[in-house]
């Protein structure tokens, strides 16, 4: 149900974390339930960071601060710095140490000014997509992209 989707997502995240970290996991939530279960292989990283991709209103930022490790967004708007500031405030209000991870999915080559603005506003990672194509095309694209990023 739409008005319960945050609860559903939180329960799935908690259930997955238990499967990743406990030898024998179980979960009993309103929407997610399972008895004694085992999941192998376990992640190498003890705490798998969970980032939520969502439009960033105040309620969403509060929810992310309370339940996730960070936020993933696309640069469709020019107010990413303000949204990151809102997330940081929610993070502090939730009593979380450090700061949330922020990843931005981009489709075009950013200018040096764009990169500086992302860094200044607290973006940790920029993520480019790759073409849905065969291996040779994807590897060629990555080589071309690597050359652009280095220049």
Predicted feature residues:
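Active-site-adjacent structural elements that line small-molecule/cofactor binding pockets in enzymes
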Residues: 1-151
């Amino acid at each position: 149900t739409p008005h319960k989707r945050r609860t559903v997502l939180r329960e799935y995240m908690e259930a997955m974390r238990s499967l990743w970290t406990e030898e024998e996991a179980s979960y009993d939530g309103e929407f997610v339930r399972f008895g004694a279960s085992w999941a192998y292989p376990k992640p190498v990283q003890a705490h798998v960071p969970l980032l939520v991709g969502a439009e960033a209103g105040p309620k969403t930022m509060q929810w992310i601060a309370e339940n996730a490790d960070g936020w993933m967004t696309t640069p469709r708007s020019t107010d990413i710095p303000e949204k990151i500031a809102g997330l940081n405030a929610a993070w502090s209000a939730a009593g979380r140490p450090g700061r949330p991870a922020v990843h931005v999915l981009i489709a075009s080559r950013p200018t040096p000014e764009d990169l500086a603005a992302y860094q200044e506003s607290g973006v940790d990672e920029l993520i480019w997509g790759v073409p849905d194509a065969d291996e040779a095309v994807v590897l060629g694209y990555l080589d071309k992209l690597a050359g652009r990023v280095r220049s």
